[in-house]
């Protein structure tokens, strides 16, 4: 089934070219189906790129998904035009009285700042509180996951000595968890971050459970017992070239950055990256939508 997106959203042509089923709003109104209402809070600088990555995954499921895009009002985006935001995005005031089946909170390149130093922290706190009462299940990604764990449970983040950068092998910690259905015993996920959340801090909170982790990159998936809040530390949504783009950008600036691990053949950045996380990403988002959004949400929100 398709994702429902606004006419002329830049991601539309890209996804259609990839054979992803996209439906525009006018056609969706003619169908007698209640689509899942999914809100994406996009905190990433390159918003069009992130939109496309997430819509690609949401559109590759049997469920019809009506996507709404949300941006932070208290922060001025320097990498996405005002015209794009005005045309395709809403603010929290626009949606605060609505109910949503699911919500995604993306990462953001602010992890070296203390949470309270982030200029939109107060607004983000209001949105995260809104997710408790107005959203069936919320999926937090990377810094969004760290921020969610800090806001909801007071769990701190810790600065890494060196950036966690590459594609790392992960294993499963739990059996019988619906979010993990169909996962291989070992699978790979990209990470790109300067901070981490410690295992011992999660274990202090009885409501939280560690579903997946990596010997090299640490925690990957943490969730509440009912999976109303899911915290994903990696970037399974990344394009094949996302880590390459980050590496090339930082190298061009003269920054001291290592080649992303397990990404290029023989760690040779002159070669094409090896994509080994795509099937995992599709399964993660499909399981979340099916088991924790679609199966748990009423036909009509009261």
Swiss-Prot record:
Disulfide bonds: none annotated. One of its GO terms (cellular component) is cytoplasm. Its main location: cytoplasm. The active site is at residues 142, 235, 237. GO terms for molecular function: homoserine O-acetyltransferase activity; homoserine O-succinyltransferase activity. Its EC number is 2.3.1.31. GO terms for biological process: L-methionine biosynthetic process from homoserine via O-succinyl-L-homoserine and cystathionine. The record marks 111 as: Important for acyl-CoA specificity. InterPro entries: Class_I_gatase-like (IPR029062), HST_MetA (IPR005697), MetA_family (IPR033752). The record marks 192 as: Important for substrate specificity. Coiled coil: none annotated. It is found in: Cytoplasm. Pathway: Amino-acid biosynthesis; L-methionine biosynthesis via de novo pathway; O-acetyl-L-homoserine from L-homoserine: step 1/1. It catalyses: L-homoserine + acetyl-CoA = O-acetyl-L-homoserine + CoA. Substrate binds at residues 163, 192, 249. Keywords: Acyltransferase, Amino-acid biosynthesis, Cytoplasm, Methionine biosynthesis, Transferase. PANTHER family: HOMOSERINE O-SUCCINYLTRANSFERASE. Belongs to the MetA family. NCBIfam families: metA. This is Homoserine O-acetyltransferase.
